Each structure stands twice: as structure tokens, then as C-alpha cells.
């Protein structure tokens, strides 16, 4: 889920929490939770009563969910819940309250470096064909350029467009780090070594978007990225940017 928040004033689209107009996977198609049992919908409430899908996450084990730090950053724990085991953003499956949220200690909200967090649920996530722990890329996981990766989520189907109540997925490709860094440097944005770029470079039309923040990016079924930010959505020149999971393998293990 990428969101337009305060950074929008700088011309920067962050895949942040609580979108004013949440957006979904661009250029993909509908799918089911049975195809992606490791993904969960993160629900947010402004008033503590009415919750709506605002970010995505990945099941680590029966009590912990991986997401983007910018989703829960600055919020009270009781503003967030986790919906597991459902194809649909706002119905079905099981809904879990949270006990705690752990933000990466080096998270930088200005450039979204180290944009990673772990939510601990108050109740166990029951595993079945619609809810399973994910395989997380290890520190030495080899992921080259132009590799097929898949993104999934409940974000917008176009930048500024309507939400998708049903889970969607899209095939994109990993983008060379130097190329991605250069493209974003041209508009004053920083791509660090902790980030992983993906999209359909110089073609566009496929991407994660607002509402997909925190959700997984898969390579051969292994989670290699956490949806973080981008310049609008699905632009030919600017790929999407994820937190690079291989940089956080130890931190994830030690905190879940």
C-alpha cells in the first residue's frame, strides 16, 4: 500500500498507512487467499470503533506479522488489527487484536529507510489452507536483476483509483539497483542498499500502489520485499520500492 501523506507535499508518494484514498495492486488480477496464505490485511481505525483495511502484512509465525514501519508508526497499538485467512479486505477470516508493535530501531520516516516492523498479535493465528507462515529470504539469498517477482495486496488498481475488496496479485521484475537509484536521484529521492526495486521498467502499468504498503513481494514463493514507497504507481520510469528483506533476516528472527 502506498499512500500520499505529508510527503506528498514534496511530490513523493509513500506507501503509507491510513490512505485518504487507499489504492490497490495495479495491472494485476484477482486471486484468492489460498494462493497467498501468508498474506494478511492490516485494519486501521481512526476512532477505535470502525476498522478498515489500510496496509498489508506477512505471517511470520502464529503470533507475529511482518509489515512496513510507516504503517503503524506513531499510532497506538489498539488502532490496528490483523485479518488472516480471508480473500477479502474487510470481511471473513479471523481478526486479531495486537499486543505490541516493534519498529526497526533505524527506521527513517523521511526517506523510509529501514521501513520494516513486526506486529505481535494478542491471539494465535490458526494455520490452515488460508493462513500459513511465510518463507523469509535469508541473508545470503541470491536475487538477481530482471527476476520475476509477484506482489499481492488489497491496494488501488490505479493511482488515485478505487480500492479492491478482493485480493489481487501482479507479476513484476526486479530492477537493477544502480538504475533504480539513478532514476529516483533525478527527482531528489534516495534509494539505499536496504531497498529493493521492482516493476516493469520503461513500460509501466504494473505495480504495488496505495493500500499495498507492508505487503509481501515474492520470488519463487519466498518473501524478498516489503512494499514501501514509490513515485505515484506503475510509472514506466519509476519502479516500486520495497524494504529488502535480506538486510533484515537477523532482526526479523530475533524479534519474532
From Swiss-Prot:
Record keyword Secreted present? yes
The signal peptide stretch is 1-17
InterPro entries in UniProt: Peptidase_S1, Peptidase_S1_PA, Peptidase_S1_PA_chymotrypsin, Peptidase_S1A, Trypsin_dom, TRYPSIN_HIS, TRYPSIN_SER
Please give the GO cellular component terms listed in this UniProt entry: extracellular region
Q: Where is this site: Required for specificity?
A: 207
Q: Which UniProt keywords apply?
A: Disulfide bond, Hydrolase, Protease, Secreted, Serine protease, Signal, Zymogen
- The source's domain of life comes to Eukaryota
Q: Which residues carry out catalysis?
A: 70 (charge relay system), 115 (charge relay system), 213 (charge relay system)
- What's an example GO BP annotation here? proteolysis
Catalytic reaction(s) noted: Preferential cleavage: Arg-|-Xaa, Lys-|-Xaa
Tell me what this protein is called.
Trypsin, alkaline C
Amino acid at each position: 500500500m502506498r499512500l500520499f501523506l505529508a510527503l506528498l507535499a514534496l511530490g513523493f508518494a509513500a506507501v503509507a498507512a491510513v490512505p485518504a484514498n487507499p489504492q490497490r495492486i495495479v495491472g494485476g488480477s484477482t486471486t484468492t487467499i489460498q494462493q497467498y496464505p501468508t498474506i494478511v490485511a492490516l485494519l486501521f481505525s481512526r476512532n477505535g470503533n470502525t476498522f478498515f483495511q489500510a496496509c498489508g502484512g506477512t505471517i511470520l509465525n502464529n503470533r507475529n506479522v511482518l509489515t512496513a514501519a510507516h504503517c503503524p508508526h506513531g499510532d497506538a497499538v489498539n488502532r490496528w488489527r490483523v485479518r488472516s485467512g480471508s480473500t477479502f479486505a474487510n470481511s471473513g477470516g479471523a481478526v486479531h487484536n495486537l499486543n505490541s508493535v516493534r519498529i526497526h530501531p533505524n527506521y527513517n520516516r523521511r526517506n523510509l529507510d529501514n521501513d520494516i516492523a513486526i506486529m505481535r498479535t494478542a491471539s494465535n493465528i490458526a494455520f490452515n489452507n488460508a493462513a500459513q507462515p511465510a518463507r523469509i529470504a535469508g541473508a545470503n539469498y541470491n536475487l538477481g536483476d530482471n527476476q520475476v517477482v509477484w506482489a499481492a495486496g488489497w491496494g488501488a488498481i490505479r493511482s488515485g483509483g478505487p480500492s479492491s475488496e478482493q485480493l489481487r496479485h501482479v507479476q513484476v521484475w526486479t530492477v537493477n539497483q544502480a538504475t533504480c537509484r539513478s532514476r529516483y536521484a533525478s527527482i531528489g529521492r534516495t534509494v539505499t542498499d536496504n531497498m529493493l526495486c521492482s516493476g516493469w521498467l520503461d513500460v509501466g502499468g504494473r505495480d504495488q500502489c496505495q493500500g499495498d504498503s507492508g505487503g509481501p513481494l515474492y520470488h519463487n514463493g519466498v518473501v524478498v520485499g516489503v512494499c514501501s514507497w514509490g513515485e505515484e504507481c506503475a510509472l514506466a520510469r519509476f519502479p516500486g520500492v520495497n524494504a529488502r528483506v535480506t538486510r533484515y533476516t537477523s532482526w526479523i528472527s530475533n524479534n519474532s
